[in-house]
Swiss-Prot record:
GO terms for cellular component: cytosol. Zn(2+) binds at residues 916, 919, 936, 939. Its main location: cytoplasm. A motif ('HIGH' region) lies at residues 58-68. Gene3D superfamilies: 1.10.730.20, HUPs, Valyl/Leucyl/Isoleucyl-tRNA synthetase, editing domain. The gene is ileS. It comes from the Bacteria. One of its GO terms (biological process) is isoleucyl-tRNA aminoacylation. It catalyses: tRNA(Ile) + L-isoleucine + ATP = L-isoleucyl-tRNA(Ile) + AMP + diphosphate. It is found in: Cytoplasm. A motif ('KMSKS' region) lies at residues 606-610. One of its GO terms (molecular function) is zinc ion binding. This is Isoleucine--tRNA ligase. Monomer.
């Protein structure tokens, strides 16, 4: 064999078999940065149609986790695929830099502002901390192969962005959506601040559930219930409420009933004492069972509307409260009579406004009753629950008491229960100017992917309260407003003043506002107007980036095409962006919204340090490389929960090896191939080569379409299938003989090299958005194209167009002339699969060794036999056997193997003849040449003659 080795076209390439990407990628990143690859892409796409994917800013605190990695990789895949589709798709990464988590981290180091450190210095420390966090996260994102304007990201703490956030507030105020209100909001006693809807999470909590009697002294109330003459009953009359927040009873100012609900006056007995209780008719049985009352009967019935303004005695304070009507009252649970504390509940507040009820607010920002709260002063509200229960027992007002496990709002940061607390706050009104309906209209115009996202955000917008945008924090964008110190009215020049403040902030940052004396801006008006001390909700910061970033930066043109974040952002960034954009501009800030699920472990559990199941992006990139992490991200259906685990990543590494090995095979067989000199015209190509190019062309259309539809798992699936089935399992296997043994410059060899070159060019672009490092590595190993020039980077170009030309020519020359087209070769692929199974069985039976030591006979029906016969003697090359014979199905022996191909039976036998030393085919013509006694005639022609001719395979 050694004598003839030099006559073979053996593969050779510098493209390594082992990726070793964990070590290779960092050097590639350094080179890309030195070459300003992102800038080169921008230059190449200048003037092209724009596609804007706006980056939702992660919070600048802590290391990135797998969820961050998934999010940024998905965005990167989209941006890279859009650039390859010849869009100008810049990507500007952002960070959310203000807010409580950063304050808390800084407090741990320097103390609270106003104590050991001034508010001004505290803000500077927050700015420095956020900058450090941004730098750390930026390096982590770069390591993932994310292409972005890393040198000029947007930060919500950039002076220019802070100024534009203030301008956004001005625009919303100018459009009439801003108002000040005294209203119950979710309040975290640990934060000492109100929370946005998106900052509230619901967790199970055990609370004291109590039924409380509010005594009614007016005996005539019994007459409102239709009872027989003389049967008014006996004992004290009382309306019974049910609540799980006993601590709110000091703020009770009414009992709400539903006007349309029927109520019963129930005669009952408790501890030998007769009493008459008012309860919704539908709940009487349930309530009596809960109270443990055996003896009871109905005295009479009336509608809730009959009870309006009946006065009830507060259970432990010396005043009465009215019965009011509220549509929010139902008979789903409780008693049908609802405890109403306007300072501690949104529905209570709304009803309270209708009846001009006092908005009692006896609870301080720290969750402790104020000093003037009778009986409970100085107690924390949650600890006071027990005190309230004891008070009710003393007063004889406690009807029943038990512990209840239920879902309750908690702070997403502290994981502690929240309270509703009425405070003076600034709101964006959802209804005053029709913002709710306008937002719903814009939601309908937007494309939501998956489509259930639309209904989700619609229901949230339909039910959400006014957006409380004020916070009582130190590190945040100020609400640059002046209000009258007595009336609270906004300064008449508020819109102009906001712009003046914005100009100052643009130069010096938010500290400019806090340093500003009112007199400097409003002159003598400072005697009557004061600065609003509040800062803006951080969701306002990020929610207005469509204005403060997209409209402010030169590389963006128009509104964003796409927002892409986790599914929790329907109630977060997607909603805050929609509401603020509609409030400012009357239109949605995006055309499409795409969501991904959360990352969970292999068992479906959320990743957490306490469970010990956390996998960090750094672990994966250090061990396997970023391309494996990127492949995993692309291969899953990211619209659902995304499963991660060591075994899962190992499987991705196996899949990666398949793609890499296929690419290496293509490259290693292009040694010495110069497209400018060696490309074979499509009409001169071997039929099988024409087919595989056509297959690749069709596949490219499907892959580009999958990228356009954001279905990256489809891209990976199709790429893997192509590498495994059409290439690895069929085409590349078949052409090895021709590639290695044919005359080096023969049409037979150059034809398959042409096909491999075109496929390699196309495949490199297909994988570039996902396997970015590997694609560039392949790109650098490809031969120069026909033009003789190649862009330095695959990312500055477009999808390969050589396949499309091949496909169009084949359509004309092949399909229409009844040659061997896609359908034919697809059927041959199936036949070959059956032959392979038969050969495998023969190997197990030890009747043959390797496939080339076998001859196969195909017993086929007339139609199938005619198709197979089209290949003539070249059928054996497709089946990779030394001989292939076609016989009629009627001549099949009894031991012929029936296949899954209709009308096909097979027999396998040892091939007759001697094994050729060069090509390893077993033939009967070996020894006929004195010069090459160990070679077959075909190999002799390929060495000394003009070379064999291949027409089909």
């Amino acid at each position: 064999m050694s004598d003839y080795k030099q006559t073979l076209n053996l593969p050779a390439t510098s493209f390594a078999m082992k990726g070793n990407m964990a070590n290779r990628e960092p050097n590639m990143l350094k080179y890309w940065a030195a070459k300003d690859l992102y800038g080169k892409i921008r230059e190449a796409k200048k003037g092209k149609k724009s596609f804007i994917l706006h980056d939702g800013p992660p919070y600048a605190n802590g290391n990135i986790h797998l969820g961050h990695a998934v999010n940024k990789i998905l965005k990167d895949i989209i941006v890279k695929s859009k650039n390859l589709s010849d869009f100008n798709s810049p990507f500007v990464p952002g960070w959310d830099c203000h807010g409580l988590p950063i304050e808390l981290m800084v407090e741990k180091k320097v103390g609270k502002p106003g104590h050991k450190i001034s508010a001004s210095d505290f803000r500077q420390k927050c700015r420095e901390y956020a900058a450090k966090q941004v730098n750390g996260q930026r390096e982590d994102f770069k390591r993932l192969g994310i292409f972005a304007d890393w040198e000029k990201p947007y930060l919500t703490m950039d002076f220019g962005t802070e100024a534009n956030i203030i301008r956004s507030l001005g625009k919303i105020a100018e459009n009439g959506h801003l108002h000040q209100g005294f209203k119950p909001v979710h309040w975290c006693t640990d934060c000492g601040s109100s929370l946005a809807e998106a900052e509230v999470e619901y967790k199970d909590k055990q609370s004291p559930a109590i039924d409380v009697k509010f005594t009614i002294s007016d005996e005539s109330v019994a007459d409102k219930f239709s009872h027989p003459e003389g049967h008014k009953g006996e004992g004290e009359i009382g309306a019974v409420i049910w609540t799980t927040t006993p601590w709110t009873l000091p703020a009770n100012r009414a009992i709400a009933v539903n006007a349309e609900v029927e109520y019963t006056l129930v005669q009952c007995e408790q501890a030998g004492e007769k009493q008459r209780l008012i309860i919704a008719s539908d709940l009487v049985t349930t309530c009596m069972d809960r109270f443990g009352f055996d003896k009871y009967h109905a005295l009479g019935f009336c509608k809730g509307s009959e009870l309006e303004l009946v006065q009830c005695q507060h259970p432990f304070y010396d005043f009465t409260v009215p019965v009011v009507l509220g549509e929010h009252v139902t008979t789903d649970s409780g008693t049908g009579c609802v405890h109403t504390a306007p300072g501690h509940g949104v529905e209570d507040f709304v009803v309270g406004k209708l009846y001009d009820l006092e908005v009692a607010n006896p609870v301080g920002a720290n969750g402790v009753y104020l000093e003037d709260t009778p009986l409970l002063a100085g107690q924390h509200v949650f600890k006071a629950n027990a005190s309230v229960v004891e008070l009710l027992k003393e007063k004889g007002a406690l009807v029943h008491h038990h512990a209840l496990d239920h879902s309750y709002p908690h702070c997403w940061r502290h994981k502690t229960p929240l309270i509703f607390r009425a405070t003076p706050q600034w709101f964006i009104s959802m209804d005053k100017k029709g913002l709710r309906q306008d937002s719903l209209n814009e939601i309908e115009k937007t494309q939501w992917i998956p489509d259930w996202g639309q209904r989700r955000i619609e229901s949230m917008v339909e039910g959400r309260p006014d957006w409380c945008i004020s916070r009582q924090r130190t590190w945040g964008v100020p609400m640059a407003l002046f209000i009258h110190q007595d009336s609270g009215a906004l300064h008449p020049r508020s819109i102009e003043l906001i712009e003046e403040v914005a100009l100052l902030v643009e130069k010096s940052g938010i500290q400019a506002w806090f340093d500003l004396e009112a007199i400097e801006l409003i002159g003598d008006d400072a005697k009557e107007y004061i600065k609003v001390p509040d800062t803006l909700d951080v969701w306002f910061d990020s929610g207005t980036t469509h204005e403060s970033v997209i409209k402010a930066r030169d590389e963006f043109d128009g509104i964003a095409d796409l927002y892409l974040e986790g599914s929790d952002q329907h109630r977060g960034w997607f909603m805050s962006s929609m509401i603020s954009s509609v409030a400012m501009n009357g239109a949605a800030p995006y055309k499409q919204v795409l969501t991904h699920g959360f990352v969970v472990d292999a068992k479906g559990h959320k990743m957490s340090k306490s469970l010990g199941n956390v996998i960090t992006p750094k672990e994966i990139t250090n061990n396997l490389g970023a391309d494996i992490l990127r492949l995993w991200t692309a291969s899953v259906n990211y619209t659902q929960e995304i499963t991660a685990g060591d075994e899962i990543f190992k499987r991705q590494a196996d899949a990666y090896r398949r793609i890499r090995n296929t690419s290496r095979f293509l490259l290693s067989n292009l040694t010495g191939f110069e497209p400018a000199n060696h490309m074979v015209a499509v009409e001169d190509m071997v039929a099988l080569d024409r087919w595989v190019i056509d297959k690749a062309a069709r596949l490219q259309e499907e892959i580009i379409n999958a990228y356009d539809e954001y279905e990256f798992h489809v891209v990976v699936h199709k790429l893997m299938n192509f590498c495994t089935n059409e290439l690895g399992g069929f085409y590349l296997d078949i052409i090895k003989d021709r590639q290695y043994t044919a005359k080096s410059d023969s049409n037979a060899r150059r034809s398959c090299q042409t096909a491999m070159y075109l496929i390699a060019e196309a495949m490199t672009a297909w994988m570039a958005p996902i396997l970015s490092f590997t694609a560039q590595e392949i790109w650098e190993a490809l031969p120069l194209p026909v033009s003789g020039e190649r862009d330095e980077f695959v990312f500055t170009g477009v999808w390969f167009d050589g396949l499309m030309k091949q496909e169009s020519k084949q359509d004309e020359s092949t399909e229409s002339s009844d040659e061997l087209g896609n359908e034919y070769w697809t059927e041959l692929l199936t036949v070959r699969g059956e032959v392979n199974r038969a050969l495998e069985q023969a190997r197990k039976d030890k009747s043959v060794g390797k496939a080339l030591e076998a001859q196969v006979t195909l017993f086929a029906t007339a139609d199938l036999a005619a198709k197979l016969a089209k290949l003539g003697d070249e059928l054996r090359f497709v089946l990779i056997t030394s001989k292939a014979t076609i016989e009629t199905v009627t001549s099949a022996p009894e031991n012929a193997l029936e296949t899954e191909v209709e009308g096909l039976w097979l027999t396998v036998a040892p091939a007759e003849g001697i094994k050729c030393e060069r090509c390893w085919h077993v033939t009967t013509d070996i020894g006929e040449s004195e010069k090459h006694p160990t070679l077959c005639g075909r190999c002799i022609t390929n060495i000394d003659g003009e070379g064999e001719t291949r027409q089909f395979a």
